[in-house]
Amino acid sequence: INLRDAVNGTISYSNEAGKIYQLKPNPAVLICRVRGLHLPEKHVTWRGEAIPGSLFDFALYFFHNYQALLAKGSGPYFYLPKTQSWQEAAWWSEVFSYAEDRFNLPRGTIKATLLIETLPAVFQMDEILHALRDHIVGLNCGRWDYIFSYIKTLKNYPDRVLPDRQAVTMDKPFLNAYSRLLIKTCHKRGAFAMGGMAAFIPSKDEERNNQVLNKVKADKSLEANNGHDGTWIAHPGLADTAMAVFNDILGSRKNQLEVMREQDAPITDDQLLEPCAGDSTEERMS
C-alpha cells in the first residue's frame, strides 16, 4: 500500500505532534526491493506450500503499479537481494519475461539491479549479468551482507576469521578487490556498478555528526575513485555529502562506464578470500 501511494504521489504521514511528511515534487526514482528468494510468504500457498516471498512482492508491486509507472515515464524497477548463483538470476529473467509477455509489454520494460552480497555470487558476476541481460541495470556491492556471507561460508576455517567489525572496511584488500572486480565486470558488459551502503546515521551532536560525515566522505571517495557509478546511503541526511563526493570526481560525466580497471592485475580467488588483519576482542563478540 505504501509503495502504491508512493507511485501515485499520495503517500504522507502525520506524527503525534502534527508534523506532516509528504513527497516533494520530482522525487527520486522508486525501486522496489523484494525479499530474498529464501524467505517464504506464509499467507499465500501453492499446492500446500508457501510461495517465495520475493515472488509475492514482485507480483503485487508489478501488477498494481506498472501502468502508473509507465504513464509517468518511469517503470517497474527492482532490487534483487541475497542472490547465490546465476541460476537464480536466470529464474528471475524468466519471471520478468513472462510478466512482460502476459501484459503485452516490450522486452526489457522490467529492469533490475542485483546485489552481489554473497560469497558464491561474487565468483559468478559474468554469468549473472548474462542471465539477466534483457533486464539488468547493474550490480551493487551489498557489502554488509557480503561480509556476513564471508563469515558464514568460511566459519569452519580458523585462518579465515575476520577481526572486529570496525576494522573490516572497504579499503581492506579483500573488500577492495571485491569492489574493483564488480566494477571491472559490470563496465565490461555495459552495466552500472553501484557502491555499497553507508550505514551511518546523522547525529544531532555536532562533533559526532562531523565524524559521521567524514567517514561517509572517505567511504564514498574510495568508491568513486575505484570507478563506481553511484552509491547507497542509509539516511537521506547523507545524500548531499555522498552526492558532493561523486559530483567532484565525476564532474560532468553521468557515470563511469569508461573506467575498465585495465591497470589492475587479475583479481584472484585468493585475494577475494584473504581475511584482513585486525584485533578480535571478546568485547566485540558480545
Predicted regions and their residues:
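Conserved alpha/beta-domain cores
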Residues: 1-286
